[in-house]
């Protein structure tokens, strides 16, 4: 399997598209989270700064559990897709939070979604690639994610600037996360295990 074959492989191209969509949500959320929490809660900046530790801690714990559970069950696709679907719920529900505490809860769900499956995700390309092919494919996947990392924050800022609300940007990022989750489930089951 050469590097050129890897870069033309439909599985690699699908992984690149998935990561592009995922990272739109990942960086859009990460970049704007403090401002979104402040606007939804009305809390002073010092409280917002401390509150950010809560969703990040939740995401860390889920990421550790997700990796452990994936390894134990020898399953990857549903572990990653489930976190993305949880993130979708967080993105879609956050703008409708009736109280600061509920908005923080939905932001926790979003954080779990954008961070929770990341460790398991990066084991997927190496189930069918190795050596230079794996390096080239992972470079392509990561580059497409970097493009998503530009789109997400810029898009959310643009939408907020034109509508005065983060809601529509959160809906778009939720849709991106949902589509990424669906695409994960279309990957072949063989990507659950490393090929010999």
Predicted features by range, described:
Residues 4-67, 118, 122, 152-153:
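Extracytoplasmic gate region of multi-pass secondary transporters
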Residues 18, 140-144:
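Hydrophobic alpha-helical segments of secondary membrane carriers
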Residues 37-38, 69-71, 155-164:
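Interfacial helix-cap and linker-helix signal at transmembrane-aqueous boundaries
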Residues 47, 133-140:
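Cytoplasmic loop-to-transmembrane helix junctions
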Residues 59, 84-91, 176-180:
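MFS 12-TM fold signature
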Residues 74-124:
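C-terminal transmembrane helical hairpin of 12-TM major facilitator-type secondary transporters
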Residues 125-135:
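Paired intracellular helix-loop junctions of major facilitator superfamily
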Residues 174-196:
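Multi-pass alpha-helical transporter architecture, strongest
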């Amino acid at each position: 399997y050469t590097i050129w074959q890897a870069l033309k492989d439909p599985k690699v191209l699908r992984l690149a598209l998935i990561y592009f969509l995922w990272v739109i949500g990942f960086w859009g959320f990460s970049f704007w989270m403090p401002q979104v929490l402040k606007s939804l809660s009305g809390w002073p900046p010092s409280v917002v700064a401390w509150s950010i530790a809560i969703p990040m801690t939740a995401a860390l714990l889920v990421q550790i559990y997700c990796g452990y559970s994936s390894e134990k069950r020898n399953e990857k696709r549903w572990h990653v897709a489930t976190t993305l679907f949880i993130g979708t719920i967080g993105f879609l529900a956050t703008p409708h939070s009736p109280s600061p505490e509920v908005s923080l809860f939905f932001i926790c769900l979003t954080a779990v979604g954008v961070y929770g499956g990341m460790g398991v995700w990066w084991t997927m390309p190496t189930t069918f690639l190795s050596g230079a092919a794996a390096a080239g494919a992972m470079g392509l996947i990561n580059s497409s994610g970097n493009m998503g990392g530009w789109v997400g924050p810029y898009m959310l800022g643009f939408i907020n600037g034109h509508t005065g609300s983060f809601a529509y940007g959160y809906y778009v990022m939720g849709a991106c996360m949902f589509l990424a989750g669906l695409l994960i489930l279309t990957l072949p089951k063989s990507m659950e295990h490393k090929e010999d």
